[in-house]
């Protein structure tokens, strides 16, 4: 499996793990109760929000506007029953999509560079900040939740280093 496909697969796995309905079935095996206690502030006062707006200085509307521009630029639309556009699972799923786009254009330098610029911009402007906020704000001592957040934090930091290196090349 090529590198972009591996990266895409990791993003997909992490996106599913941060989704309430799929968290228990994934490799981290987080129960619904533990998920709510760790990540749903509407149900647990000590929970860490998985929404970017909780970890950013900008107001919600400007965050949403920029996120929707990213998604729509690549032809993606939000289903009205979907998570909010600033939810960690949605942002990870978008990076799954962007990394998946690398393979078909691997032999087209301009298109590949454009996709990699989008990855760089999205990671540095949105996903990196969100993951850092969740990592710093997690209060749960549940081992599966801790492992999920640590794994995501480490992976995103590796990805940030990769996209910065590629941007300088």
PLM regions: where:
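Surface/interface-facing alpha-helical segments and adjacent flexible terminal/loop regions used
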Residues: 1-169
């Amino acid at each position: 499996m090529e590198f972009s496909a591996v990266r895409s697969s990791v993003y997909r796995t992490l996106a599913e793990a941060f989704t309430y309905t799929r968290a228990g079935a994934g490799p981290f095996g987080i129960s619904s109760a533990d998920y709510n206690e760790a990540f749903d502030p509407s149900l647990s006062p000590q929970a860490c929000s998985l929404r970017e707006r909780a970890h950013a200085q900008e107001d919600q509307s400007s965050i949403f506007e920029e996120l929707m521009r990213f998604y729509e630029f690549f032809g993606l639309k939000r289903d009205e029953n979907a998570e909010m556009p600033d939810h960690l699972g949605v942002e990870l799923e978008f990076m799954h999509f962007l990394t998946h786009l690398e393979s078909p254009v691997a032999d087209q330098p301009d298109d590949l560079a454009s996709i990699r610029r989008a990855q760089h911009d999205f990671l540095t402007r949105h996903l990196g900040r969100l993951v850092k906020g969740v990592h710093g704000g997690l209060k749960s001592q549940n081992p599966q939740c801790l492992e999920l957040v640590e794994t995501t934090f480490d992976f995103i930091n590796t990805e940030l280093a990769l996209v910065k290196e590629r941007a300088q090349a």
